[in-house]
Amino acid sequence: MIKQLYANLFKKLSVADGIPLLLLRLYLAPVMIQAGWNKASSFSSIVDWFGNEDYGLGLPFPLVLAFLATAAELVGGIFLLLGLLTRLVAIPLMVTMLVAIFTVHIDNGWLAIADASSWLADGTILMNDSVMAAPEKLSAAKSLLQTYGNYDWLTSSGSLVVLNNGIEFGATYFVMLLVLFFYGGGRYVSIDYFALSCEITTLGSLPLK
């Protein structure tokens, strides 16, 4: 009885199974488009940063890689928004996230913002000495600003924090893109779905030989 009710419930809910995929796309699209736009707007600086070994990533073929990263994020973000070729565009975006994780963020641990109370920094799960030292540095910075700066104005847009720049965002985006890679843009809510539906309808109308 319960098993049948459970099956019937989720059978009815399956008509809306495209909504989570739509929400993933709507979440990711502006992030990717903005990242691609920023790269395109300062492309020469991005190329320098990709190739420079002193202050950048020291990657080979920086012009090619910068172009590919920019195109993947800018074009891929637009395609995600539309639900067009969702599985295909997820691939270069996942590669871009992996490159960012392993060339920029991995040495900083997991957290994007230094939070010494996090289990991902205090040794409960992971240990990050830099994050654990952040509260003392933040306290010193606040003290200086309270003494010599307009502290109320400086914090009127939000509290001061220490940026850790770990892999948190990159890994999260990668997982979201991985879901889209396996499940596509979503039923009823993507161009992919309607294009495939039209193709199936067309094939179904062809005479059998």
Name each region found by the language model.
Residues V47-F61:
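Perimembrane loop-to-helix junctions flanking transmembrane segments
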Residues M1-S45, P60-A71, V75, L82-K209:
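Extended, low-polarity transmembrane helix blocks
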